[in-house]
Amino acid sequence: LLSEKTVNGKEITPNLNKLVQKSLYFPNTFEQVNEGTSSDADLMVNTSMLPLRQGSTFFRYPNTNYNSLPNLLEGEGYATSAIHPDKGSFWNYKNGLLGIGFDKFTDYYSFNVDEQIGLGISDKRYFEQVVPMLKELKQPFYAETVTLTSHGPFDLPEKYRELGLDPELNESKLGGYFESLHYTDKQIGYFINQLDKEGLLKNSIIAIMGDHTGIHKYYDDSIGQLSHKEDWYLNTGNPTVPFIIYNPSTNEGKTFDKMYNGEIDVMPTLLYLLGVDKDKYENTTLGRNLLNTNKSFAVITNGTLKGGENLTDKEKDIYKKSLDLSDKMIRANYAHNSN
């Protein structure tokens, strides 16, 4: 997230910047995906488990049982739905997400893909069709949805480019990244406004998270080729993604800028906010509730521990081993075998 960053005096993500002021914001959320990339993010957010050490979890073990976010919320009376702009066969999303516990899976074939940008349907046309789908769900509901336009290769059509970048930057991958994020930010603003108009916003909590890093993960070399570079263009070596929790019923936000955390911490944090008894999940999640912890750390996929200054050496060793522990638990179908 290019929080509060500007080019030519224009904010890259003005809608998200406003949202952050009224949200719980975790700017040091570390990417923990492995070989399943985007699908690993779906896994972690919904199960608080780290992905397999080799291959895609959704392809290799789509039928593993989990004490998952959708399963737990179904127990609280929620309908659950996963909505994806990709085809269900991509990363084996359909089998993987239904296996995790979602009641319903909606994919590419349910959308009118009359405008495509990059990998698939434009975020504008996607959100225009997602809102009616959400309106049809029985309340209360938990819905997960994914956007595509801010994903590489960042080839946003000129007609949607609004930042007025200089020619060199505009033609570069970095410029395309800025413009793609600006476009997606605009569509997120539209989406939230539409939820409000349809009466869906006031009783909702909206969590926004990136699945993995963008420009530096795949196009880092292209930045070095620019004749002019701002310091903040450069790779810091910390692969972080945004994690924002917006509750429209509260006006005060809080930024946890000293907190280091990972994608596996999303599920226990959301369950805490939704009032689900911690006894139902705290012994089956590898992540932690970020609103009730003094531990600041994340284990990334190469085994590096980020943060953790207040951890003992024994704790650091245990957390580093969580990568292999999760791998064994998934392959052993831990939730099924514990019942």
What is each of the regions a protein language model found here?
Residues 1-339:
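Solvent-exposed soluble domains appended to multi-pass membrane proteins
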